UniProtKB/Swiss-Prot annotation:
Protein name per UniProt: Brevinin-1SE
Entry comment describing in which tissues the protein is expressed: Expressed by the skin glands.
Signal peptide: none
UniProt xrefs under Pfam families: Antimicrobial_1
Keywords: Amphibian defense peptide, Antibiotic, Antimicrobial, Disulfide bond, Inflammatory response, Mast cell degranulation, Secreted
Keyword Cell membrane: no
Known role: Mast cell degranulating peptide. Causes histamine release from rat peritoneal mast cells in vitro. Has antibacterial activity against the Gram-negative bacterium E.coli K12 and Gram-positive bacterium M.luteus NCT C2665.
GO biological process per UniProt: defense response to Gram-negative bacterium; defense response to Gram-positive bacterium; histamine secretion by mast cell; positive regulation of mast cell degranulation
Sequence similarity: Belongs to the frog skin active peptide (FSAP) family. Brevinin subfamily.
GO cellular component labels: extracellular region
Organism whose genome encodes this protein: Lithobates sevosus
SS bond partners: C17-C23
Subcellular location as annotated: Secreted
């Protein structure tokens, strides 16, 4: 379970960055 949460926490900021173009 923890690796999944850690993966999501890593993935979400990059998705937000890609959508909003604010990194």
């Amino acid at each position: 379970f923890l690796p999944l949460v850690r993966g999501a926490a890593k993935l979400i900021p990059s998705v937000v960055c890609a959508i909003s173009k604010r990194c």
